[in-house]
Amino acid sequence: MESFTTHKGIGVPLRRSNVDTDQIIPAVYLKRVTRTGFEDGLFAGWRTDPNFILNLAPYDKGSVLVAGPDFGTGSSREHAVWALSDFGFRVVIASRFADIFRGNAGKAGLVAAQVEQSDVELLWKLLEEQPGLELTVDLENRTVSAGTTVVPFNIDDYTRWRLLEGLDDIGLTLRQVEAISEFEKSRPSWKPTTLPARISQG
């Protein structure tokens, strides 16, 4: 997973609250076995409207989504995070996130930055008045900047650390590869074990 320190990109004001995972990506788009290629399904029900924000330049090139409260509610589907990332988003800013969405985001390299609703309103105003305005998200200092405007955001320490280090679940496991190997050596031969790499990769 790519590490995240700071990101600067066009902000997208999504003036909608309670955006659930089925609205983020409808279930019909989940019928694949890969983890990429979900961008076509992102907000598919809304993108049929030519005036939807992601159909308008320069917002269609945005990478920082500023949404209403309770973003990512509904069913637990990692595809919601994958669709946002595949479209090009690196950050979602909102005043409240569904817990499962926030967890999935952190594991997949998407920053879920929680700010006060008053700051969401301020960012919406700036982005609508200045289309193409770039937001700078600084994970180390937990701030979002828009020109001279700087607002703080919340993210838990553990998720922040994982994002800064670029560690997904596999990356975390591989940090313990020596301990895992030693454990495997001590296991009785009659117990289940992993296949040698040359066999499992064949």
Swiss-Prot record:
One of its GO terms (molecular function) is 3-isopropylmalate dehydratase activity. Its EC number is 4.2.1.33. Keywords: Amino-acid biosynthesis, Branched-chain amino acid biosynthesis, Leucine biosynthesis, Lyase. Pathway: Amino-acid biosynthesis; L-leucine biosynthesis; L-leucine from 3-methyl-2-oxobutanoate: step 2/4. It catalyses: (2R,3S)-3-isopropylmalate = (2S)-2-isopropylmalate. HAMAP family: LeuD_type1. This is 3-isopropylmalate dehydratase small subunit. The gene is leuD.
